Amino acid sequence: MAYQSEYALENEMMNQLEQLGYERVTIRDNKQLLDNFRTILNERHADKLEGNPLTDKEFQRLLTMIDGKSIFESARILRDKLPLRRDDESEIYLSFLDKKSWCKNKFQVTNQVSVEDTYKARYDVTILINGLPLVQVELKRRGIDINEAFNQVKRYRKQNYTGLFRYIQMFIISNGVETRYFSNNDSELLKSHMFYWSDKQNNRINTLQSFAESFMRPCQLAKMISRYMIINETDRILMAMRPYQVYAVEALIQQATETGNNGYVWHTTGSGKTLTSFKASQILSQQDDIKKVIFLVDRKDLDSQTEEEFNKFAKGAVDKTFNTSQLVRQLNDKSLPLIVTTIQKMAKAIQGNAHLLEQYKTNKVVFIIDECHRSQFGDMHRLVKQHFKNAQYFGFTGTPRFPENSSQDGRTTADIFGRCLHTYLIRDAIHDGNVLGFSVDYINTFKNKALKAEDNSMVEAIDTEEVWLADKRVELVTRHIINNHDKYTRNRQYSSIFTVQSIHALIKYYETFKRLNKKLEQPLTIAGIFTFKPNEDDRDGEVPYHSREKLEIMISDYNKKFETNFSTDTTNEYFNHISKNVKKGVKDSKIDILIVVNMFLTGFDSKVLNTLYVDKNLMYHDLIQAYSRTNRVEKESKPFGKIVNYRDLKKETDDALRVFSQTNDTDTILMRSYEEYKKEFMDAYRELKMIVPTPHMVDDIQDEEELKRFVEAYRLLAKIILRLKAFDEFEFTIDEIGMDEQENEDYKSKYLAVYDQVKRATAEKNKVSILNDIDFEIEMMRNDTINVNYIMNILRQIDLEDKAEQRRNQEQIRRILDHADDPTLRLKRDLIREFIDNVVPSLNKDDDIDQEYVNFESIKKEAEFKGFAGERSIDEQALKTISNDYQYSGVVNPHHLKKMIGDLPLKEKRKARKAIESFVAETTEKYGV
C-alpha cells in the first residue's frame, strides 16, 4: 500500500475540520487575510459601529495599533479590549476574542496561505478565530520524523511570521500518526515544550484524526486558548497547559461548584502542580458564590516561592501575607479574592482573631493546599476546619499517603480529602517526556555479605551510626563519588545532591571531601547545609563540638569560593543563595555536590541537577521525593536522573515505585539493563555500517536522502552511547561493543561536518533542502571538557623556550581541533590553527599568551569586517554597529539593516539581508568567547 502524501493528509484534515464546524475559506495571501479580518471585525461589532463599518483610515489606525508587536504583546492585545478613535472623534472599544462564551467566536479554516517577506513560505493549515490566525498546523507525510515539522515551524517563525501571523497562539504539528501542540513565543521554541494530548485517563491521543476530534472542535479550541493558555508576566512568555493539568482543573472546578465535597489531585512530582493549582484557584476566585480562595502552603521557604510562581502567571494575583494581622485584614478585604499564606499563619489568625473572621463561619471559602501530605496532617488543619464551617478543601500532592505509608496518626490522604479527582502518575509523566526516568545504582560498601541479608535482626543490629560512619567506610564512599562524579554529571555539566542520615554524618563527609579535595587537580566545589539547634544535645559527650561551629566553617568556605558574606546569623540568606546556585550557578561557577540531611529533598526544582548520592535509609514518599530532584527535563545530554545508593535500597525503591506508579512493572520508570542497551547498540552499529562502512566514506555521499539516512543512523547510535556511559561496566572498546572510541569520534566528526555544511548552506542560499529541518540534537554530542577554555589551558602550559615540547603541544591541539564537538570551538578552529602555526613560534617566555591571542583575534575580526564590508559595498562602521547591537540583544536591528542595504531590487535586497544576518550571527559567536 502506498503511503499517504502530505497533500492528501492536508486535504483530509481540511475536510474533517469543515465537518467539525469550521467555515472553509480561501485565503491565499496577506491582502485577503486582512480583508477577511476586517469583514469579521465589522460583523462582530455591528451594534457598536451603528451601521457604519470601519473606514479605510480607521482600519489603518487599528492596524497601526495591533501590528508589529511582539508575540507576547500580541497575546495581550488578543485578550484585551482596544479603544479606537473614529473619524468623527468618537471612541469605541473593539474585542478580538470572546473569552467566556467560547462558541460565540467565528471559526474558519484555510490552507496554503503564501507569505513573501524576506523569504517565501506557504503554510499548510491555518485556523482563524474572528479573522485572526490563532493556530497554525504544519504537516509531514507519514514516516517523516515529527521533529522536522517542529524545525520547519522554528524556521518559518524566524523568517516569515509577521503582521497578523504574530497573533498565532499555538502550533500543531503532525505526521498523521504522531501529533503534538505547543505555544508560540518570542524566545526560542523548545522541543521540551511540545505536548501530547490525551484523554482523562492519560491515554495518549496520537493520530491527527483523533487529535482533531478531541482537541480541535471549535468551542474546545477557543476554550483552550482563552482559559488554558497562560501569559507568564515575569518571563514574558505564553504557556499552554498540558492535558492532565486541564482535566485536573476541570474536575476540581466541577467538584467545587456542583458539590460541597472535598477532593485531592495526585500529580507526580515535577509535573507542574503549581501551574495547575494556580489555574484552579484563579477560576474559582471568579465564581460569585465563592467569597475567598485561600492557597495554603506549609513551609516558610515555599511561601515566597509559591507567591513568585503565582505572580508569574498573573501579575499582582497574589498578596502574600507577612503576619497574622495582615492576613486578617486581607481575609476581610473583598477586593482580594485570592490569598497565599501558610497553614501556620492561618491557625494563628483563628486562635487570636476568631471574632474578626465571623463571616467565614457561613460564607463559602475554598482552600487549595499545596503538597497536602505535608501541610494537612496535624492539629492545625483541625483548628482551621472547626472555624470555617462552609469550606471546601482541595489538596495537591505528588506522593499521597496510603495505608503502606500513612501519617503518624494512621490517616491516609483519602481519609482527609475524600475522593481523588485526577491522577497523573510518574509512569505517565515519563511516558510523555514531562519528567525523566531513573538510572539507579546500588554500591555495596561492606565486604560482609551478611550485611545485605534479609535477616531483620542483622539489619537492626548494624543500623547504627558507628557502623555506617566508620572512617574507612566514609572514605570509601567519598572516594567513589570523587572518582565517578565527572562521569555521572557529564564532566560537571550538571550538579548533584548527597543526602546523608544525620548532621553528624554530614559534617564527617564534608570534612572528608575537604581533605581529599586538596589532592585533586580539579577540586570539586562542595557545600553543606543543615539547621542547627541553639541548645542541641551533645549526645553524652560523644561529639566534641556544637554543630553551629561546623556550619560556620562550611559557610566561611562558601564565602571564600563565591565572594559572599553569610554567617550562621543569616542562614536564610545562605539557603537562598545555595538554592540559586544549584539551579543556575553563580558567576560562572556552581556547586558540584551539595551535602544535606533533609533540606532540598522536597519542593526544590533544578533542571541542571542530575545526580543524587544516597547514604541514608529512604522509604515510600520520602524516597520518591528525593529521587525526583534529579528528573527534571533539560536537554538531550540529560537522558535520566542518576541515583547512586550506598545502601541496599533495592526493595525500598521497588516498593515505592510500585505504590506511586500503581504497577508492578517498573521498566517504564527505571533504565533498562546494561545488556539490553548493549544489544540495542550492536543493532544500531550494524545499521550505521550498512549505510557508511567507514567514516571517510561519508565524504563520498552525493545523494541527500542517503546523507539523511547517515545522520539519523549516527544520531540513534549517539543516543545509545549516552545511556551506556551511565553504567560502570561500560568500556568503549572493540572487545566490549565492537567499536572503539576513535572510530566513534571519526563518525561524530563527519556528523558535525554535515551539520556545519547544512547550517552554512541554509544561511547562504535561499534553498530548501531535506536536511534543513533534520534535528541534529547537537547538545547530545557535546563534551563539555573539550572547549575553548580547555584549548587555552593547553596553550598557557606551552614552554615557549622548549621548541620540541612546543611542537608536541601544537600537534596535540591540532588533533583535538580535528575532532572538536563544541560549537564555539569548531567556529574558532581555523583561528586557533593559524595562531599556533604563525604566532606561537615567534613568542618568547616573557609574552602573555592570553593577551597575544586576544590581540590576534582582534586583528582577525577587524580584517573580516573590512573584507565583508568591501565585498558587499556597505559601510563598515554601520556593520559594526549592527554587530554590537546583536551582541547584546540577539536580534539584528531591522531599521539599521534596511538603511544599510539601501534601494536594491527586491531579490538582491533579500540576498544582501540574509548574508548580513548570517555574517553578524557567526562573527558574534566566533569572537564572542
UniProtKB/Swiss-Prot annotation:
SS bonds (residue pairs): none
Binding sites annotated in the UniProt record for ATP: T268, T269, G270, S271, G272, K273, T274
Top-level enzyme category: hydrolase
Record's keyword terms, sorted: ATP-binding, DNA-binding, Endonuclease, Hydrolase, Nuclease, Nucleotide-binding, Restriction system
GO BP field: DNA restriction-modification system
GO molecular function: ATP binding; DNA binding; type I site-specific deoxyribonuclease activity
EC number: 3.1.21.3
Domain Helicase ATP-binding: start-end pairs: 254-418
Cited Pfam families: EcoR124_C, HSDR_N, SWI2_SNF2, T1R_D3-like
Catalytic activity line of the entry: Endonucleolytic cleavage of DNA to give random double-stranded fragments with terminal 5'-phosphates, ATP is simultaneously hydrolyzed
UniProt xrefs under InterPro entries: Helicase_ATP-bd, HsdR_RecA-like_helicase_dom_2, P-loop_NTPase, Restrct_endonuc_type1_HsdR_N, Restrct_endonuc_typeI_HsdR, SWI2_SNF2, Type-I_R_enzyme_R_subunit, TypeI_RM_Rsu_C
Classification via PANTHER family: TYPE I RESTRICTION ENZYME ENDONUCLEASE SUBUNIT (PTHR30195:SF16), TYPE I SITE-SPECIFIC DEOXYRIBONUCLEASE PROTEIN SUBUNIT M AND R (PTHR30195)
Role, per record: The restriction (R) subunit of a type I restriction enzyme that may recognize 5'-AGGN(5)GAT-3' and cleaves a random distance away. Subunit R is required for both nuclease and ATPase activities, but not for modification. After locating a non-methylated recognition site, the enzyme complex serves as a molecular motor that translocates DNA in an ATP-dependent manner until a collision occurs that triggers cleavage.
Subunit architecture: The type I restriction/modification system is composed of three polypeptides R, M and S.
Miscellaneous comment in the UniProt entry for this protein: Type I restriction and modification enzymes are complex, multifunctional systems which require ATP, S-adenosyl methionine and magnesium as cofactors and, in addition to their endonucleolytic and methylase activities, are potent DNA-dependent ATPases.
Family: Belongs to the HsdR family.
Protein name as annotated: Type I restriction enzyme SauN315I endonuclease subunit
Species of origin: Staphylococcus aureus (strain N315)
Gene behind the chain: hsdR
